[in-house]
Amino acid sequence: LEVKVNTVIRAGYNEHSVKMVADRFIGSDVIVRYIEFMDVGQTNSWNLDEVITGEMMQQMFDELKPLKANHTGEVANRFLRGSQEIGFIESVSKPFCGECNRARISADGALYTCLFASSGSDLKALIRMDATKEQIADAVRSIWTKRDDAYSQNRGSAEHKKVEMSFIGG
């Protein structure tokens, strides 16, 4: 069983505990991943000034050896600290929209092609019409290939109302 502990780091709140979190899991197989504070909806009072970048966090460690990605679209930049794996998810300072391969389906049956989306595509209607697995797969493929979301890359270029990330499983 692979266990990952994801920790959001926010300036003025917990940036002092970056190394302590990793130290807590030394000697275990737990992978520690640090996440830049993201604008995940309208409820977390996000402010760019409160982002501690992955690079800033990496500088808090003495010796990190880069690891290759496990697969295409991997979101964490991975490192070894001794025998401990540590990752940094840098969606604010180093957006990875072009390599993203993640879609989410909300509890109400909408397919979201971006964690920062303002709306999704209705899959529930297809299911209620007794669509086959192939028809649903074709619809998902079509939605995915037509997607043009790149919110993290375009952050700040326009006002953008987002669905709460917690609603779509982020």
Where do the language-model regions lie?
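Short flanking/linker segments adjacent to small metal-binding domains or redox-active Cys/His motifs
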Residues: W144-G170
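Conserved C-terminal portion of the radical SAM core fold
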Residues: L1-N44, Q58-L64, D108
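Accessory C-terminal segments flanking Radical SAM cores
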Residues: V40-S152
